[in-house]
Amino acid sequence: MAISKEKKNEIMAQYARHEGDTGSVEVQVAVLTWEINHLNDHIKQHKKDHATYRGLMKKIGRRRNLLAYLRRTDVNRYRELIHSLGLRR
């Protein structure tokens, strides 16, 4: 199931850097994290759903690249983001 518009707007409002911010790294990573967590729950129930597993791996790779970019450019924002999302780095 894809993320609902309401949930996505809620995440954007929480992690946006300014009014109307929809594309900052923080917002993208937060949305990807929600989607990854949702897909993880799906994969636990449907172990043989390989297409969803592949999509999950692509989202994890995209999030990893965005986090690496953020760490390279602004370490303080990176640390705040991983702390607020509860990621293990």
Curated annotation (Swiss-Prot):
One of its GO terms (cellular component) is cytosolic small ribosomal subunit. One of its GO terms (molecular function) is structural constituent of ribosome. GO terms for biological process: translation. Disulfide bonds: none annotated. Keywords: Ribonucleoprotein, Ribosomal protein, RNA-binding, rRNA-binding. The keyword Cytoplasm does not apply. Coiled coil: none annotated. It comes from the Bacteria. SMART domains: Ribosomal_S15. Pfam families: Ribosomal_S15 (PF00312). CDD domains: Ribosomal_S15p_S13e. PROSITE patterns: RIBOSOMAL_S15. One of the primary rRNA binding proteins, it binds directly to 16S rRNA where it helps nucleate assembly of the platform of the 30S subunit by binding and bridging several RNA helices of the 16S rRNA. Forms an intersubunit bridge (bridge B4) with the 23S rRNA of the 50S subunit in the ribosome. Part of the 30S ribosomal subunit. Forms a bridge to the 50S subunit in the 70S ribosome, contacting the 23S rRNA. Belongs to the universal ribosomal protein uS15 family. This is Small ribosomal subunit protein uS15.
